[in-house]
C-alpha cells in the first residue's frame, strides 16, 4: 500500500495572512510532525498551493464571492508557511520530482498526473486548510478518481474558514466514505 500525504494550501495568506486564523496557526506543528513521520516511513507527500495571478482574481467567480486577494503568485502570502517550507526544497532526498502542486481553483483536477488511476494500492491522507473549501473538494476529487482507495482526513490537522464549517465539512466527508480521524 502506497501512503501519500497531501498538505492542502498551508500558505501564509491562509495561516497568518488576510484569511488566516488561530485554528490554522494551531495545526502547523502537527502537520510538520506528520510530514516527518511520512519521511521516516519512506512515504511521499505533496503540497497544494492556491495560486492566483495579480489583477485577475477579483474578476473570477471566487473573487466575486470572496473579494479578498490572496495567494497571489510569487508573493509572500503565496509561499508555504516557514515551518513547512523546508519540505519543499530538497525534493530529490524525498524521492519526489515535484511536490508543489499549483491550483487556481478549490480542487486539483489532474490527480491522475501523479498517481496511476487504475491502481487501488493508494492510501491518501489529507491535512490543511480550509476544511470546508479546498480540503473537502480535493478529498471528493480523490474519491471520484480513486473510488477504491482509502482516503483519510486528519481533523486535528485541518482548520476551516470557521469552526462550525470545519465540523460540517467533516460530516459531509464521512458520508462520502472518507475516513475522518
Regions found by a protein language model. Name each.
Residues 10, 50-51, 129-131, 157:
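Active-site metal-binding loops of divalent metal-dependent hydrolases
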Residues 23, 69, 127-128, 157-158:
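A generic structural signal for short
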Residues 88-91, 133, 143-146, 177:
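Short, well-ordered alpha-helical segments in soluble proteins
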Residues 2-4, 139-160:
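Long, low-complexity, intrinsically disordered polar/charged segments
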Residues 100-137, 159-181:
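Conserved N-terminal glycine/acidic-rich loop preference
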Residues 31-38, 136-146:
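Histidine-anchored nucleotide/phosphate-binding helix
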Residues 1-100, 150-152, 167-175:
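Active-site acidic carboxylates
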